[in-house]
Amino acid sequence: MSYTPLPNINDFPTLGNPLEDAKRAAAYRAVDENLNFDEHRIIGVGSGSTVVYVAERIGQYLKDEKYHDKVSKFICIPTGYQSRNLIQDNGLILGSIEQHPHVDIAFDGADEVDHNLQLIKGGGACLFQEKLVSTSAKIFIVVADSRKKSDTNLGINWKRGVPIEIVPSAWSRVQHDLTSILHANSAPVRQGGSAKAGPVVTDNMNFLIDADFGEIQDPKALHEQIKMLVGVVETGLFIDNAHRAYFGKPDGSVEVIDKK
């Protein structure tokens, strides 16, 4: 291991993309301000484009002589295939939630965050593992760019619906119940796109439905109603889970919001 001084975010050249600069600024600051090298050992590493910079920043601490001994003992818990690769690519120790069910701190992104730090997650099809890791953590920190912040309710900026992980054989039943009982505007099964025929299959071998409820006034009540439907594994509504959120802006500044 060759040691290098920990790079300061202000010394980095631009990535050439204001959005990526915003994501990096949010992620680096979140790690710098919340990772406790004396108390934290089990670290949750989430999924998504902003979390790339979380893993990168922790990896930079690993290469710094001052922090190496402590960071080398961190065990990082992934939420999916992407985060597993991020952990390994940055030289960090890979663990599992089965081996380490009690997580000290977790970092993850979000598709939308409302004024109460309620979240929509699951656009990347990892919502069950993301919720398992984040709810197992003593501290859950959200990192995102400012497009993901809603000053009012969920469903304002994120227009793709609430991701819902379902048992494959129940897709028709759940789809019907979402539209007829819970009055979703639509509830399509997420498809794999041009590279894959048929539905997206999660890491848990389930399907996903993206249910459009428009603006969500009461995300906790909606989450509970969806969970009661037979065939639903988990929803992408993360309720009273996040402790703090970091939103990177294109000008390089970062807005920090704490749970009220």
From Swiss-Prot:
Pathway: Carbohydrate degradation; pentose phosphate pathway; D-ribose 5-phosphate from D-ribulose 5-phosphate (non-oxidative stage): step 1/1. Keywords: Cytoplasm, Isomerase. SUPFAM superfamilies: D-ribose-5-phosphate isomerase (RpiA), lid domain (SSF75445), NagB/RpiA/CoA transferase-like (SSF100950). GO terms for cellular component: cytoplasm. Its EC number is 5.3.1.6. It is an enzyme of class 5 (isomerase). InterPro entries: NagB/RpiA_transferase-like (IPR037171), Ribose5P_isomerase_type_A (IPR004788). It is found in: Cytoplasm. One of its GO terms (biological process) is D-ribose metabolic process. It catalyses: aldehydo-D-ribose 5-phosphate = D-ribulose 5-phosphate. GO terms for molecular function: ribose-5-phosphate isomerase activity. PANTHER family: RIBOSE-5-PHOSPHATE ISOMERASE. Belongs to the ribose 5-phosphate isomerase family. This is Ribose-5-phosphate isomerase. It comes from Candida glabrata (strain ATCC 2001 / BCRC 20586 / JCM 3761 / NBRC 0622 / NRRL Y-65 / CBS 138). The gene is RKI1.
